[in-house]
């Protein structure tokens, strides 16, 4: 399954994996998964976290290693994001609920994820998604960006 991913996707997923793998030991634990999900405004129970890990934990050791993470991401991409998941993700970024993601909101979420971005990196991310050029990302632009990934 993971062999259907491009080099670029694999390197993006490596970056995402390292955001989750807080202690850098090459595995994601329920604790690390919980930390990232809470920083995204979710509040999973211990049982939910264990279920999420067990879903992709091929070798049954209670953690997710990078190959298991790739399999999970490949599966998720195949099931392409449902409208509902995209709406939820948009809400995570759109802190003030005004229907737009500003540079400040984007920076805030990325910082919570442990990604320290420069202003120019944030501006670049906004520019890439900002079809109408108003300096923010609206829902339609967000959907387009999510589906083009």
Curated annotation (Swiss-Prot):
Keywords: Acetylation, Calcium, Isopeptide bond, Metal-binding, Repeat, Ubl conjugation. There is a cross-link at residue 22 (Glycyl lysine isopeptide (Lys-Gly) (interchain with G-Cter in ubiquitin)). Ca(2+) 4 binds at residues 130, 132, 134, 136, 141. Ca(2+) 3 binds at residues 94, 96, 98, 100, 105. The record marks 116 as: Not N6-methylated. The modification N-acetylalanine is found at residue 2. Ca(2+) 1 binds at residues 21, 23, 25, 27, 32. GO terms for molecular function: calcium ion binding. Ca(2+) 2 binds at residues 57, 59, 61, 63, 68. The keyword Iron does not apply. Trimethylation of Lys-116 observed in other calmodulins is absent here. It holds the Pfam family EF-hand_7. It comes from the Eukaryota. Residues 8-43, 44-79, 81-116, 117-149 form the EF-hand domain. GO terms for cellular component: myosin II complex. Gene3D superfamilies: EF-hand. InterPro entries: CALM/Myosin/TropC-like (IPR050230), EF-hand-dom_pair (IPR011992), EF_Hand_1_Ca_BS (IPR018247), EF_hand_dom (IPR002048). Calmodulin mediates the control of a large number of enzymes, ion channels and other proteins by Ca(2+). Among the enzymes to be stimulated by the calmodulin-Ca(2+) complex are a number of protein kinases and phosphatases. This protein has four functional calcium-binding sites. Belongs to the calmodulin family. This is Calmodulin. It comes from Agaricus bisporus.
């Amino acid at each position: 399954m993971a062999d259907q991913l491009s080099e670029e996707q694999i390197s993006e997923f490596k970056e995402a994996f390292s955001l989750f793998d807080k202690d850098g030991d090459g595995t994601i634990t329920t604790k690390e998964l919980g930390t990232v999900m809470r920083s995204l405004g979710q509040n999973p129970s211990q049982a939910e976290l264990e279920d999420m890990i067990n879903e992709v934990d091929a070798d049954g050791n209670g953690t997710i290693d990078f190959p298991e993470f790739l399999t999970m991401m490949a599966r998720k991409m195949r099931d392409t994001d449902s409208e509902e998941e995209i709406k939820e993700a948009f809400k995570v970024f759109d802190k003030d609920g005004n229907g737009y993601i500003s540079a400040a909101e984007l920076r805030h979420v990325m910082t919570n994820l442990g990604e320290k971005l420069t202003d120019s990196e944030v501006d670049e991310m906004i520019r890439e998604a900002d079809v109408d050029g108003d300096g923010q990302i609206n829902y339609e632009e967000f959907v387009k960006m999510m589906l083009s990934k």
